[in-house]
Structure formats: C-alpha cells, structure tokens
C-alpha cells in the first residue's frame, strides 16, 4: 500500500453565540441538567454529569481484539460504512488468518500497518480462508440516508460537512447525499495497491499521526481503535521506504486476532463508548471548542473534527 504524507489546516474565529450553541442544545435536551447554568463546563464535568444511557457497550460481534506481545488492541468495526470489507475481516479473524503475522510498517506521524509481509510473493503468501474474498468493490462512501449524523458547526477543508455518526468521525456531502468515514487519529483502514485494487482487509493500518485527510474516500475505512492505541503509536519507526522495516527481526509479531464474540465472556473487553447522538456529546463538543480552563489565554472558539475526543470507558461493574 502506498500512502503519501501531506498536511493542511485553516484557522477561523467563531462568535460567542456560536460557541454557546451546542451547550444550549444540550441543556434543552435535558441530558446534562447540572450543566445548563454553566455554559463553560469542562469536558471532565460534562462526562461526570453523563447518564448511563449516554453510553453504549461494544458489540462483541463487531469488535476485533488484536493481541501483541505488549498487550491488546481493541478495534470497533464499522459495518454500517463498509459491510463487505468488515465481513471479510471477520472471516479472516474467525480463520485465525492474522495469527503469527506481523506489524510491517510504522511510519512516523502517519500509520502503523500490519498483515502478511510476504503477500506479494505467491510462493510465500499466506492463503486466504475459503470464505474470504481476495477482491472486493470499494466502500469509500455510502448513502447518508438514515444516518444519525451529528453535524459539527465548524467548517472543514476536505468535506462540505463533518460530524459524527455511531461513534465515528464522518464527512457528508448534502448535494450527493453521501457520507464517509474520516482518517482521524486511531481510525483503521484497508491497505490496497493502485486501482482497481480496493484491498481485502488482509492488510490493515491505523492512523498514528496528524490526520491524513487527503486519504478520505480513497481507501476503505473499517473502524476505530478504542483501546490499546498507545501500543501501536509507540512502536519503533521503520527505517525503510515509507516506514517499512528493513530487518524482519524488527517487526512485531501478532499473537492473535479474534472477534470479541469468539472469546470467553470473561476475556471480552468491557468497554463503553459515548453515544455521539446525545446532548451530552454536544456539550462535550462545546466544552472543547471554547476552552474555559484557566490555562487558556485565547480559547479558539471552534474545533476540527479530528480534534474532538470520542470517549471510551471501562463499563461500570454490574450492581449486585
């Protein structure tokens, strides 16, 4: 997979009314009544005032657990955006395809990539399981119809509109009524070669640097790392071209990749993700757009989509 690095950004100023708009929405919805009189609440205060219904548990059937020597990486899959690729990845996981393969590329401020290092060598490449496909149509975007899209009020360089849906950062074009996942930090995509190759999911990567948004709608994005991101971001950088390791001994071995639904219940990740369609999430965005902490001299009054935190927490222990 050939991914090129590029940076771009803009800075604009918001009015006080716009800065308070999301807090007003949140207060009207009643999800954070304790914050209604405090438009300058911090993110920590917003989360502390959240309700159990503001959070959702990960679906074990849509959750990948990748075990490395350093620990576990948990990935929430986005079948609602890339159903064919996600189904293929699930087939690969059920067949234990990734077990014993390696992390082959760590490019600074860009991606960590894993899969079969010998995939380009027919004599050495690991065969795909019978129920997995080697070629799939692209899933770079989908219809926006029926999508619970929480639009961010600030502008964007790459998309007409940006926001969040089902816990993922999303771009939307109202003219074509299409939506797509964004290449924010922690997002997971499918490695591919030049078109017409669209990747099968046998080679995956996670964004570990500044969001490479020029990749949006050029690669199928299949999910987001919700735990263990530090394990992927802290790996030694590859010294070869595009961050690939020159020495195979420097690669990190993958001990296993499983769907959480295949793990014993006691070994499944007990994680909850903040719902992005809630007033609590709207209040969180407002808190991050207009930073009220005493450290800030000039709060920005706006925020880019990839700078909005998507909180994950360990699920509270069940009451006896």
Task: Set out the residue ranges of the language-model regions.
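N-terminal secretory signal peptides that target proteins for export/translocation
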Residues: 1-11
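Cyclophilin-like peptidyl-prolyl cis-trans isomerases
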Residues: 2, 30-320
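Intrinsically disordered, low-complexity Ser/Thr/Pro-rich tracts
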Residues: 10-15, 67
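N-terminal non-cleavable signal-anchor helices
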Residues: 11, 24-26, 33
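Bacterial N-terminal signal peptides
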Residues: 16-28
